[in-house]
């Protein structure tokens, strides 16, 4: 959820990529950091998986290879969308919009209150009150 708040450090281009993606648009790759990380598939991840290309190096060496590219994708997001590092879990398919953090917290509090009210009703019914 925090990837999709206005206050996140993600670029608007990155957040739009998350909105458009589904859970099948992710891949587990070592291509950016050297450690397995779930991210959106793109030309970068596909190139690292292409037969004949080298395997990613271990951490921290792989990031020494890719670190400048990651920085460039944040600096020029519109021009680098096809190779950007977009770490995200399979929950990406549930992202629909960018919100303010306060709105997310308010929604969660309301959902909590509704859930506890429902549990109270179930408990009262079970106790025969």
In which residue ranges do the predicted regions lie?
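Conserved active-site-proximal phosphate/metal-binding subdomains
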Residues: 2-129
